[in-house]
Design a protein with these regions (language model features):
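Conserved P-loop NTPase "ATPase switch" module shared by AAA+ and STAND
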Residues: 37-58, 77
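Amphipathic alpha-helical "lid/sensor" segments that cap RecA-like P-loop NTPase cores
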Residues: 8, 13, 97, 115-154
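Conserved AAA+ ATPase core "coupling" helix
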Residues: 104-114
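Short hydrophobic/aromatic beta-strand immediately N-terminal to the Walker A/P-loop
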Residues: 1-4
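Sensor-1/coupling segment of RecA-like P-loop NTPase cores
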Residues: 52, 64-90
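A short helix-turn-beta junction within AAA+ P-loop NTPase domains corresponding to the substrate/partner-engaging
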Residues: 88-102
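Conserved catalytic segments around the Walker B and adjacent sensor/switch elements
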Residues: 20-34, 43
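P-loop NTPase Walker A phosphate-binding motif
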Residues: 6-25
Length: 154
C-alpha cells in the first residue's frame, strides 16, 4: 500500500491506525535502516518518507523483498507519487495507492476531530470551519487545538 500526500494530510496517522494491534517494523530511508536484514524482521513493514529513498542499494533491497515475499505486507508513505521503480507493482495491481484527495476529512470527521480535543462547536461553526479548511487534516487539527485552548474562533 502506497500513501502519497503533502505534509499534514495524516498519512502517518492513518498508517498507525491501520496497523494498530499488528506487529510491524517502522523504517526510514534517511537513517539507512532499509537493509535486507531489517526487511526480514517482520511480516509487515512500514516505510515513512519514501520520497527520501535515494539510495539505489535501499531501493534494490526493497524491490527484492517485495518480489521474494508475496506474503509480506508493505505500507509505504511518501510526499510524492509512486516512483518509476515501483510502477510495475502498481500497474500489476499489487501496489494499492491512496492519494491525498482520499485523505481530506469530511464535515462529520471535522466535527469528530473537535470532539477529540474536548470541544464541540455549533453546527454553523463546524460548517464554517470545514469550508475554510477544505477538510485539510492539519488545518482542522490546528484549529481544533486553538479552539480547545479557548482561543476565539475568527
Amino acid at each position: 500500500m502506497y500513501f502519497f500526500a503533502p505534509c499534514g494530510f495524516g498519512k502517518t496517522t492513518v498508517a498507525n491506525e491501520l496497523l494498530k494491534n499488528k506487529k510491524y517494523i517502522r523504517l526510514s530511508p534517511e537513517s539507512g535502516e532499509i537493509t535486507a536484514d531489517a526487511l526480514k524482521k517482520a511480516d509487515i513493514v512500514l516505510i515513512d518518507d519514501m520520497q527520501r529513498m535515494e539510495s539505489e542499494e535501499e531501493r534494490q533491497c526493497l524491490l527484492l523483498s517485495i518480489r521474494e515475499n508475496p506474503q509480506k505486507r508493505f505500507v509505504l508513505l511518501s510526499r510524492s507519487r509512486v516512483p518509476g521503480w515501483l510502477m510495475p507493482f502498481q500497474v500489476s495491481g499489487l501496489l494499492v495507492t491512496v492519494e491525498y484527495d482520499e485523505l481530506f476529512l469530511s464535515r462529520s470527521e471535522t466535527a469528530a476531530v473537535f470532539k477529540s480535543f474536548g470541544t464541540e462547536p455549533g453546527e454553523q461553526e463546524i460548517t464554517d470551519i470545514f469550508k475554510r479548511t477544505f477538510g485539510y487534516p492539519l488545518a482542522v487539527t490546528l484549529t481544533a487545538r486553538e479552539i480547545s485552548r479557548k482561543t476565539a474562533y475568527d
